[in-house]
């Protein structure tokens, strides 16, 4: 199956992507991982992307799209793929559709994991990280034995700058502004599968399976 995975920060996309990867035996293609691999291998597009990333600039669509195409022709994508982090805009979605069509292919579905904003805020702002060993906790869902202290090494736990309420709200605003047109684009094409991501993790993957016509009991 050829799939796209959408969802805001904190929606649990990584967890669900691993489940989908295992159940459908298709590669999980994260844009971030794809950039890092292309840069590491020193491909022409990877070198172009590196210039923009090192300069703190957005990688242009033509470079990103080229990298995606480069990745999707690899042998492990013969039976499908799960794209995560691409497309981000309608222009990218149109480019992907056009390229797939030129190969006689099309997307099978777009999975949109939806979680209420207050739940996302709780998930993200509650994260704590050990400044010494990097172990991660959550004040509600995975608290340390001693509040504020790492179970592994006893050092202080801190909240990352990315996880403050102001920063999380900004990230969610940017995501919603950027993704709303994309969601509408795929809804109009009958590809969108909206999934309640506020359920327990096992329930979410079962819901994804049902949306794809699979019985993953």
Swiss-Prot record:
Q: What is this enzyme's EC?
A: 2.7.4.3
Q: Where in the cell is it found?
A: Cytoplasm
Specify the pathway.
Answer: Purine metabolism; AMP biosynthesis via salvage pathway; AMP from ADP: step 1/1
Q: Give me the residues that bind AMP, please.
A: 31, 36, 57-59, 85-88, 92, 160, 171
Which Pfam families does the record cross-reference, listed alphabetically? Answer: ADK, ADK_lid
Q: Which UniProt keywords apply?
A: ATP-binding, Cytoplasm, Kinase, Metal-binding, Nucleotide biosynthesis, Nucleotide-binding, Transferase, Zinc
Q: Which residues bind ATP?
A: 10-15, 127, 136-137, 199
What is the protein's name according to its record? Adenylate kinase
Q: Which organism is it from?
A: Moorella thermoacetica (strain ATCC 39073 / JCM 9320)
State the reactions this protein catalyses: AMP + ATP = 2 ADP
Query: What is the first-listed, main subcellular location in coarse terms?
Result: cytoplasm
Record: residues binding Zn(2+): 130, 133, 150, 153
The region called LID is annotated at 126-163
Q: What does this protein do?
A: Catalyzes the reversible transfer of the terminal phosphate group between ATP and AMP. Plays an important role in cellular energy homeostasis and in adenine nucleotide metabolism.
Q: Name one GO molecular function term.
A: zinc ion binding
Q: Can you list the GO cellular component terms from the UniProt entry?
A: cytoplasm
Q: Give the GO biological process terms.
A: AMP salvage
Question: What free text does the record give on domains?
Answer: Consists of three domains, a large central CORE domain and two small peripheral domains, NMPbind and LID, which undergo movements during catalysis. The LID domain closes over the site of phosphoryl transfer upon ATP binding. Assembling and dissambling the active center during each catalytic cycle provides an effective means to prevent ATP hydrolysis. Some bacteria have evolved a zinc-coordinating structure that stabilizes the LID domain.
- Assembly with partners or alone: Monomer.
> Where does the secretion signal sit in this chain?
none
Stated family: Belongs to the adenylate kinase family.
Renumbered residue ranges of the record's region NMP: 30-59
């Amino acid at each position: 199956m050829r799939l796209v995975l959408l969802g805001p920060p904190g929606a649990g996309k990584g967890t669900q992507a691993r489940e989908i990867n295992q159940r459908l035996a298709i590669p999980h293609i994260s844009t971030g991982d794809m950039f890092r691999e292309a840069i590491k291998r020193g491909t022409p597009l990877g070198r172009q992307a590196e210039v923009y990333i090192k300069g703190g600039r957005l990688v242009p669509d033509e470079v990103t799209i080229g990298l995606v195409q480069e990745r999707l022709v690899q042998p492990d994508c013969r039976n499908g793929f799960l794209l995560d982090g691409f497309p981000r805009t309608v222009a990218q979605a149109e480019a992907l559709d056009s390229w797939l069509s030129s190969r006689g292919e099309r997307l099978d579905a777009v999975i949109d994991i939806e979680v209420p904003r207050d739940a996302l805020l709780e998930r993200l702002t509650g994260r704590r990280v050990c400044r010494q060993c990097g172990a991660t906790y959550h004040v509600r869902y995975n608290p340390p034995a001693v509040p504020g202290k790492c179970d592994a090494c006893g050092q202080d736990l801190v909240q990352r700058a990315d996880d403050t309420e102001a920063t999380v709200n900004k990230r969610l605003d940017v995501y919603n502004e950027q993704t709303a047109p994309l969601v509408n684009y795929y809804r109009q094409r009958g590809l969108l599968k909206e999934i309640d991501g506020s359920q327990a993790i096992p329930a979410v993957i079962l819901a994804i399976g049902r949306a794809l016509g699979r019985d993953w009991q």
